[in-house]
Design a protein with these regions (language model features):
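Short glycine/proline-enriched loop/turn "hinge" motifs that connect secondary-structure elements
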Residues: 37-44, 127-132
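Flexible loop/turn segments at secondary-structure boundaries
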Residues: 35-38, 55-58, 97-98, 144-147
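A conserved FAD-binding loop/helix module that cradles the flavin
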Residues: 141-164
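Conserved FAD/dinucleotide-binding core of flavoprotein oxidoreductases
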Residues: 41-76
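Mid-domain catalytic core of redox enzymes
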Residues: 1-40, 179-184
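A glycine-rich dinucleotide-binding beta-alpha-beta segment and adjacent secondary-structure elements
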Residues: 22-30, 75, 79, 83-145
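Active-site-proximal substrate-binding core of FAD-dependent oxidoreductases
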Residues: 164-199
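Generic recognition of stable, solvent-exposed alpha-helical segments in well-folded globular domains
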Residues: 24, 64, 68-72, 106, ...
Length: 201
């Protein structure tokens, strides 16, 4: 479920340009236990709620704002068709840009990494292999093809294929995860150059 702020363009300006928390934030709510009943006990749900906010910025003190913004998101959930959520919460975890930066080393807590616009999406993101420096590879949400966990996995697959090609590793055109469990199938013919990898989340 997506709840879009009444003034969506203003909401985007607050995130991208003004670097402030919106009084009317857009939110995304997912209940994964609807399709996977192993995620919660019978009759209960797991809710994932995303409220896009600015990256770490002096305008937002998350130590001071965390609780109030969390309450604001709960109120937005009622507008999106989820009334009385507060009284039914048994466990919750609030993750802010400070947490993404401090605990998970996501630069400035920006989970979408580069600007999330058409000029910095898909093939317009930095490539997975440096063109100017031999043996340097990038992987993560800041590289091609973009952010979001499934897409970051694809970035890892692209970068690992490029690395293996450069190392002269023979791999089938299409392979499963079982391929890597049997190390005898991996044959390194030669190493063309030293390699390094950098995670860019």
């Amino acid at each position: 479920t997506i709840y879009i702020a009444k003034d969506y363009e203003q909401n985007l300006r607050e995130i991208e340009h003004q670097h402030q928390l919106s009084e009317d934030p857009s939110i995304y709510v997912q209940n994964a236990s609807v399709t996977d009943d192993t995620l919660a006990p019978r009759g209960k749900s797991t809710l994932y709620v995303l409220a896009p906010v600015t990256h770490q910025h002096p305008n937002v003190d998350w130590k001071r704002e965390r609780s109030a913004f969390r309450d604001r998101v709960i109120r937005q959930m009622a507008k999106a068709g989820f009334p009385d959520v507060e009284s039914r919460i048994e466990y919750e975890r609030v993750v802010t840009p400070d947490d993404w930066d401090g605990k998970y080393e996501v630069f400035r807590g920006a989970t979408f990494n580069l600007a999330h616009n058409l000029r910095q999406m898909l093939h317009l993101r930095p490539r997975n292999r440096f063109e100017d420096i031999d043996g340097v590879y990038l992987v993560g949400g800041g590289t091609h093809p973009g952010s979001g966990l499934p897409v970051i996995y694809e970035s890892a697959r692209i970068s690992s294929r490029l690395l293996m090609q450069d190392l002269g590793v023979s791999i089938p055109a299409s392979y499963s995860s079982d391929f890597f469990r049997d190390e005898t199938q991996i044959r390194i013919h030669h190493q063309r150059r030293p390699c390094s990898a950098t995670a860019v989340t």
